[in-house]
From Swiss-Prot:
It is found in: Nucleus. GO terms for cellular component: commitment complex; cytosol; nucleus; U1 snRNP; U2-type prespliceosome. Its main location: nucleus. This is U1 small nuclear ribonucleoprotein 70 kDa homolog. Component of the spliceosome, where it is associated with snRNP U1. Associates with U1 snRNA. Involved in nuclear mRNA splicing. Essential for growth. It comes from Schizosaccharomyces pombe (strain 972 / ATCC 24843). InterPro entries: Nucleotide-bd_a/b_plait_sf, RBD_domain_sf, RRM_dom, snRNP70_RRM, U1_U11-U12_snRNP_70-35kDa, U1snRNP70_N. The gene is usp101. GO terms for molecular function: mRNA binding; U1 snRNA binding. GO terms for biological process: mRNA 5'-splice site recognition; mRNA splicing, via spliceosome. Keywords: mRNA processing, mRNA splicing, Nucleus, Ribonucleoprotein, RNA-binding, Spliceosome. Residues 216-235 have a biased composition (Gly residues). Residues 198-215 have a biased composition (Basic and acidic residues).
């Protein structure tokens, strides 16, 4: 077949010349030599005599845990020292009868004594109002004390001011507990009744089945709406189609449902 082709086409089918030989760049496989693998018995002497000058490097996780423990220890020591010196009975800023004093918390930081007086003077005459401020910056700490002249005015104000809005914030009212409750500690010393309750873990609710056993349903998607064997529906809503057929001579007078294929 090839001999019938013309010469120009036969030149296209001619074999190509062989590739030029180049010496290999790598070592031949038969001449390769790899390091010999030996056991670890000769290294046991180094494990028996530990280097006393070696100090292990502290990882980032170990450093984080160490700093956390040190910070917690300092916090506990600071609380112990503050509890020792805390004495509300001999505080020069605490003035007035403790049973006539109301405690206000969650105040707006721009609330002044005049705002509190305008809001609580309706319940009775006020002897003294003190908004606790920072000793260094002079800014409000968000809580205050109101001393009434009569104890009954305190009780009326305590009941009427629950959930009161003052300067756009809903405040919390309570009686003074520092001098009336034995062993009471404020929140800054680890006690108190305050705090943001939404940060606490809520109790988990038990999740049961979607369908209860006392609901009268069979469960699943049918819901238990099936016909009973007594000739009527299960819920007693009248006779079934078979009873209509027996009353009218075998002919069903109930409306037919159109079926769509």
């Amino acid at each position: 077949m090839a001999e019938k082709l013309p010469a120009p086409l036969l030149a296209l089918f001619a074999p190509r010349p062989p590739l030029r030989y180049l010496p290999p760049m790598d070592v031949p496989p038969e001449k390769r030599s790899t390091p010999r693998v030996s056991g670890i018995a000769k290294y046991l002497k180094y494990a028996q005599s530990h280097d006393q000058q070696y100090h292990p490097t502290e990882s980032l996780e170990e450093k984080r845990l160490r700093l956390r423990d040190e910070k917690q220890k300092q916090q506990r020591e600071r609380l112990r020292s503050m509890i020792k010196v805390w004495d509300p009975d001999h505080d020069r800023h605490v003035i007035g009868d403790p049973y006539k004093t109301m405690f206000l918390s969650r105040l707006s930081y721009d609330t002044k004594e005049s705002d509190i007086e305008r809001e609580f003077t309706r319940y009775g005459p006020i002897e003294r109002i003190r908004v606790v401020r920072n000793k260094v910056t002079g800014k409000s700490m968000g809580y205050a004390f109101v001393v009434f002249e009569r104890e009954r005015d305190l009780k009326v104000a305590y009941k009427a001011s629950a959930g009161l809005m003052l300067n756009g914030r809903r405040i919390v009212v309570d009686v003074e507990r520092g001098r009336t409750v034995k062993g009471w500690l404020p929140r800054k010393l680890g006690g108190g009744l305050g705090g943001r309750h939404y940060t606490k873990e809520r109790p988990r609710r038990e999740r049961g089945s979607r369908f209860r056993g006392d609901s009268g349903f069979r469960g699943g998607y049918r819901g238990g709406f099936r016909k009973s064997s007594g000739g009527g529906s299960r819920f007693g809503r009248g006779p079934t189609r078979s009873s209509h057929s027996s009353d009218y001579g075998g002919r069903d007078s109930s409306p037919k449902r159109r079926r769509y294929n």
